[in-house]
């Protein structure tokens, strides 16, 4: 049903497949689609093991097809979804779902997202990529498929989404600057970090993310992975990718051009803005997510990262520069 239904304005609706629909990014992608019901038609959903949540989404959205990564749960899922809904299972089922729509949101965790990335690009779909592991661990495998006719890769990570928007201005780039909130332990010394708890690490001050990304954010490992992701996405040398701590998380990233001009993308920290951008690109949609109240915004702070207290950032740079299997080892 790729582009089959018509919008009220006469254009074709954009069909959407959300793989990893029960996780943080997946559920927010469905919120974006619900906010623009005359533009987006969710035709496929997939999850790894969350049968009840996936079935509830299917009953609400009425997709044509659902897929469950754990094949042993397929029969249970089939009993709960609306009649007539096709049920797929296993890794092949997840990959198949990635070919069923105009836009594929890859919100799968870890390496399990790689087949989804490859299937979407091979099918010539627009890939709204939240699964950074696909590029970090398997960049040389993924990159050739970006040249598939019709294939588009639009990043969902707020930082890379910001860079994607700034680069649209054109012109030679001097460097990109990726912002980091600093996480829940910003300002703490290496000695103080020895006594923190998992619960504290999971209490991110700005973003609502899955547990793995939240833990990685507390150590700045996530920011290091984003440096490698930026290298793969935009083809810049690691010396041209910098990180700066920005606790308000309103400036999502910046691009400095060779003439000294710097462009930045600003919005309130709401992942739905970046998700909506990737789903609608190259268009813009009139959703309420991420809008700034400029009368309430009083300051924007920036500082260099503390690489002594947070050595994971330097480790990621080293792995990226080494290349080969080092990035895959880092993200394993």
Show the residue positions of the predicted features.
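Extreme N-terminal basic, low-complexity initiation segments
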Residues: 1-8
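Catalytic, metal-anchored helix/loop core of enzyme active sites in primary metabolism
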Residues: 8-332
